[in-house]
Design a protein with these regions (language model features):
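Outer membrane beta-barrel transmembrane domains
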Residues: 164, 168-282
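Outer membrane beta-barrel translocator domains of Type V secretion systems
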Residues: 1-141, 258-262, 266-282
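Short secondary-structure transition/capping segments
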Residues: 97-111, 147, 235-252
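Solvent-exposed flexible segments
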Residues: 134, 145, 150-156
Length: 282
């Protein structure tokens, strides 16, 4: 989500605190899970050429996952990104990408007969994200509207998994997975002046479509054998809704405080996030 949530708007530096929580429903093959993420993102962007801007960002987030049945995972995530836009009158073209390094720790309990094991693993992984987007401004005296189309590609690769703890420990070689999603939607914002403070309200409603296979597959094997088998995740939903809402408060000519909510809702997954940020223009 990070790559498609950033775009260059004004000359300045910005900081954003974020929190995210999600739920995935299980099926006959895999149990559901709960996730939570918190962290901070920092960025700097400015004008590069006429009606064009470029920005860089970095940040740290930590994700926790509870899979039930005494299984959990934690991931420390380090982000680096580049993004920008170019305007042609009312038409805006945006693009960007991020690269994330993960340090993942997993733990699960295995109970069979009189045996009880606690299997643990620590491994590294990487995620690359790219997005392109176009939007068209429709402005009147009351509200600004922007229909938009967004296409995002995500590629994930782990550096191998090697559990330890008992006879049921698993291992896996380096593996990668990819996903592509498009979003069609409408953004709206309006603003007014309250005494010496400028206030803006913004919202977004979109339809997101996932391409390709909906299940993510990992090939694993028991540590003492070479017989591999596939483990499938809970499938993502083919289609879902994207919701966003926020408020920006310009406390002076240089500083803007923001508070926002984002949600992705589908039949199998519910994902919610809140963020608070500050932009300092120069």
């Amino acid at each position: 989500r990070i790559a498609s949530d950033i775009k260059a708007d004004d000359n300045g530096a910005w900081a954003k605190l974020l929190g995210n929580w999600g739920h995935a429903s299980g099926n006959d093959n895999a149990t559901g899970y709960q996730t939570s993420t918190y962290g901070v993102l920092l960025g700097l962007d400015g004008e590069l050429f006429d009606d064009g801007r470029l920005g860089v960002m970095t940040g740290y987030t930590r994700t926790s996952l509870d899979g039930g049945y005494q299984s959990d995972a934690h991931s420390d995530n380090y982000h680096l990104g580049l993004y920008g836009n170019k305007r042609f009158g009312a038409l805006a073209l945006r693009a960007g990408g991020t690269y994330t390094w993960h340090r993942i720790d997993t733990s699960r309990s295995v109970n069979y007969g009189a045996q009880s094991d606690r299997e643990k693993a620590s491994y590294n992984a990487r995620t690359g994200q790219l997005f392109i987007e176009s939007g068209y401004d429709w402005t009147n005296d009351t509200v600004n509207l922007e229909p938009f189309a967004n296409l995002a590609y995500t590629h994930y690769r782990n550096e191998g998994i090697n559990e330890h703890g008992g006879a049921a420990a698993l291992r896996g070689d380096k593996q990668s997975q990819s996903a592509t999603a498009s979003t069609l939607g409408l953004r709206a914002d309006t603003q007014w002046q309250a005494d010496s403070v400028a206030i803006a309200l913004r919202g977004e409603l979109g339809w997101q479509h996932q391409y390709g296979k909906l299940e993510r597959k990992t090939q694993l094997m028991f540590k003492r054998t070479d017989a591999a088998f596939d483990v499938n995740s809970v499938p993502v939903s083919r289609d879902g809704a994207v919701l966003k809402a926020g408020v920006d408060v310009a406390v002076n000519k240089n500083a803007v405080l923001s508070l926002g909510y984002g949600g992705q809702l589908s039949s199998n997954h519910q994902d919610n996030s809140v963020n608070a940020g500050m932009t300092w223009r120069f």
